[in-house]
Amino acid sequence: MSIPNSPDYQLEQSIASLFSAVTGVNVYTTTRTGARTFPYIAISARPIRQLVTPYSGVYEMEVAVNYSDSSAKVSSSTFDTTYLDIFASLYGTGQSLQFEIQDNSTDIHVYMARISSQTPTIQIAKRAWNKGLVISAIVTPDPTGDGQAELDFSQYLNSQYLAVI
């Protein structure tokens, strides 16, 4: 589960806000607990690694965006049409994905974002259509967006001491 001020939480919230224009679909992030009702979009961000750069706090993130709907109630063509609406909302204003995410976020700076893969499947056991995509992003939790992470000296075990000394 993500911490509210962590880069993965902020990235999930920013991407979730992009889907507000898609009607009739529930949007869930990893911080949402409980049952999910069809149709839904599940968003899950996780850090892959911290990039070695002159500045500390730059992360490579992977965001899984999965769309699911009941195959008993929805035809495959309707499912695909809704998925295309979801896909189009990632590029709603005609900007690149990086700027779309950045425009909906205040606490992270997005250096790069791209769709790295898509996974179409149908789950027979649950009688659900499921289609997803993976977004790769490079972000820093810097609210000023100048590329330098803020140093917090309140904890003596802060790993950023090494970069400063």
Give the location of each predicted region.
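Charged, amphipathic alpha-helical segments and their flanking helix caps
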Residues: 1-25, 46-165
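A short, hydrophobic beta-strand-centered structural micro-motif
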Residues: 37-47
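Short acidic low-complexity segments
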Residues: 27-36
